[in-house]
Amino acid sequence: MKKTFLIFFIFIGQLFALDLNFNTFSSNFTQIVKSKNSTLSYSGHFILSKDQAYWSYDTPSKKEIYINKNQVTIVEHDLEQVIFSHLDNIPNLNEIFKKASLIDKDKLVAKYDNINYTIKLNQEQIQSISYKDEFENDVIINLNNQIKNPKINSDVFKAKIPQNYDIVR
């Protein structure tokens, strides 16, 4: 599941960097992951810059994810732990969008690494991204309250790590 989250974060960050003209971007999101036996729903907000991302999950549990290029820090409040990770296999999203096809004025499809992505637009803004992940889960991410180029304090991209949390590397 963590790999699914990380691929999505990198995907959305690169999507906005390549497809929309902006320096920073923020949005609220809901993410629904459906497997054969269950459906999980997540919500929160994210802030992106060209090289960094901050994701805050509010439900079902509080979690923050900080991405700086290919370095990832995940603060898991329910587990009182912080996970440091390095992404070696980041999808080549330039290739995804070179191969993307406009199905109609509000829908794009792209295939990369045997994963098909559907991107739905509304008035040239991304409304949702859906795909089937490597575990055969159906993933739908809906965006709302999108803001292009908000002023962002760079401190938002620095992980806030409580002293009593366990560190996992």
UniProtKB/Swiss-Prot annotation:
Annotated signal peptide: 1-17
Main location: periplasm
Annotated Gene Ontology cellular component terms: periplasmic space
Superkingdom of the organism of origin: Bacteria
Cell location: Periplasm
Keywords linked to the UniProt accession: Chaperone, Periplasm, Protein transport, Signal, Transport
Keyword Transport: yes
GO terms classed as biological process: protein transport
Subunit structure comment from the entry: Monomer.
Function noted in UniProt: Participates in the translocation of lipoproteins from the inner membrane to the outer membrane. Only forms a complex with a lipoprotein if the residue after the N-terminal Cys is not an aspartate (The Asp acts as a targeting signal to indicate that the lipoprotein should stay in the inner membrane).
Family label: Belongs to the LolA family.
PANTHER family given in the database record: OUTER-MEMBRANE LIPOPROTEIN CARRIER PROTEIN
The name this protein goes by in its record: Outer-membrane lipoprotein carrier protein
Organism this protein belongs to: Campylobacter jejuni subsp. jejuni serotype O:2 (strain ATCC 700819 / NCTC 11168)
Lineage of the organism: Bacteria, Pseudomonadati, Campylobacterota, Epsilonproteobacteria, Campylobacterales
